[in-house]
Amino acid sequence: MNTRTIALLLCLAPSAVLACEPGEKLVFSCPTDKGKHVEVCQAPTAINYTYGKPGQPAEMKLSEKNQAFVWEHGEGVGSGVGDDLVFKNGATSYTISHVSNFDDSTDTEAHISIRQPGKEDAFIQCVSGKTKFISKAIKAKSREMSEGVPNF
C-alpha cells in the first residue's frame, strides 16, 4: 500500500477523535490522566463535545445547539481565572471546569464532572498544564459564577 492510499484511508476513517471540523473553532482541549482526550468545538450554531482515545473513533460525541450550554466565568478563583462550560445529555449533566493562574497562563488545571441521578459523581482529570481553553470562541449563554448553579 502506498503513502497516498494510507493517507486517503485515514481521511475516510470513521470520525477519528480530535479535530474540529472545518468551520468550527476550538473551545476546550485536554489530554486526560487515563490517556484519552476531551475536545469541545464551536460550530456556527452548535457546540460539539468529543471524548475518546486519540486516533480512534470517538467513545462519545455530542452536538447541541448553543442555547443548551452555559458558560460561567469567574475572576479571582483562588489565584486565577475560572471557567465552566455546563451542559446536559438527557438526565446526565456535564461541567468542564478550567482554572488558569493570573501570573502564568500556562499553569492550568481542568477536569470534567459528570452527574447522573442516583449515581456517584464521576470525574475526568485533565493533565496539568496541557489544557487549552479559548473563551472568546464560545457562543453559549454567558453568566458569572457568582450567580449560582445554572438552572436547566
Predicted segments with their positions:
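Absolute protein N-terminus
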Residues: 1, 18-19
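Cysteine-centric segments in proteins
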Residues: 19-152
